[in-house]
């Protein structure tokens, strides 16, 4: 198992917390299924089948946020509300007013909710207390914010901060393309996005296309900046760096897969092997990426 997206946060290095202590903090906010009148429920679930809320291996920790959401489209609510309102109008002899329509809609929603289908999703969290990383496997900041909100609620005085680097990803990626060179330990791949800073936000995208230095420089000279760049770290992991310092499309390459523990006898052992490999490599990759962006700086 590998994370696909990395929303990156900072913790003190080292962060002195045990898996047992963290699990105790999470327990009051463990996942509970939606009640008959709830649209959504969120809480911590066990990353493995042993029931523990914190998976811990080699001083690395995994958490898992579970979300249940009822599927009750607004169009369905409105249709049933319209039918119900027509029945009431016939009974009372006049159209329901705004307040009464609101009450009808609430009653319809309460009536439909217990029969609504549910969808479930899970969001993984990796905590590296040794090196001070916390990473959420989420494709958007909004999904990561759900994790952070509940984690802050669960852990008193959580020392979590946003990662701040000396050079913005946009500035750094643009400079790498202009110089036609990648930072130490990285290579530039064939996907990139160049976007103008003006009102029109004109955008050029290269997808699996060789980046011709002269063409790219012309776009940059015309006022565009690099907002997404596909890269590979140490010939081991490919990814896309974005303007917001989010890492997307994380993919372990063949050399990583070859190093996977082939002696694993079952799913549990394979999971342990994957997590040890992933956390070790990603921790080193994040450190190298921060260095490539001029190093970490304190928030002013």
Curated annotation (Swiss-Prot):
A molecular function GO annotation: double-stranded DNA binding
Keyword field contains Cytoplasm: yes
GO biological process, one term: DNA recombination
Superkingdom assignment: Bacteria
NCBIfam families the UniProt entry points to: PRK00321.1-4 (NF001463), PRK00321.1-5 (NF001464)
Role, per record: May be involved in recombination.
PANTHER family named in the record: RECOMBINATION-ASSOCIATED PROTEIN RDGC (PTHR38103:SF1)
Name of the protein in its database record: Recombination-associated protein RdgC
Annotated gene: rdgC
């Amino acid at each position: 198992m590998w994370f696909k997206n990395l929303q990156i946060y900072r913790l003190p290095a080292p962060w002195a917390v045990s898996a047992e202590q963290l699990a105790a903090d999470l327990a009051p906010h463990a996942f509970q299924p939606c009640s008959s009148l709830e649209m959504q429920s969120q809480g911590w679930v066990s990353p493995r089948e042993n029931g523990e809320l914190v998976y811990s291996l080699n001083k690395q920790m995994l958490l898992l946020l579970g979300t249940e959401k009822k599927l009750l489209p607004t169009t369905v609510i409105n249709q049933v509300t319209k039918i119900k309102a027509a029945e009431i109008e016939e009974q009372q002899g006049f159209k329901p007013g705004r307040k009464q329509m609101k009450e009808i809609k609430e009653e319809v929603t309460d009536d439909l909710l217990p029969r609504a289908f549910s969808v479930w999703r899970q969001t993984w969290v990796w905590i590296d207390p040794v090196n001070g990383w916390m990473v959420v496997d989420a494709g958007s900041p909004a999904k990561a914010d759900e994790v952070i909100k509940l984690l802050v609620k669960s852990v008193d005085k959580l020392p979590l901060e946003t990662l701040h680097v000396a050079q913005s990803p946009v500035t750094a990626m643009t400079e790498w393309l202009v110089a036609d060179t990648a930072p130490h330990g990285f290579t530039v791949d064939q996907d990139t996005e160049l976007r103008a800073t003006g009102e029109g936000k004109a955008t050029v995208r290269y997808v699996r296309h060789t980046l011709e230095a002269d063409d790219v420089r012309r776009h940059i000279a015309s006022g565009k900046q690099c907002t997404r760049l596909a890269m590979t770290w140490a010939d081991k992991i490919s990814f896309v760096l974005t303007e917001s310092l989010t890492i997307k499309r994380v993919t372990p390459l063949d050399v990583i897969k070859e190093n996977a523990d082939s002696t694993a006898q079952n799913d549990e052992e394979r999971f342990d092997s994957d997590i040890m490999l992933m956390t070790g490599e990603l921790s080193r990759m994040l450190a190298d990426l921060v260095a490539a962006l001029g190093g970490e700086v304190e928030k002013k």
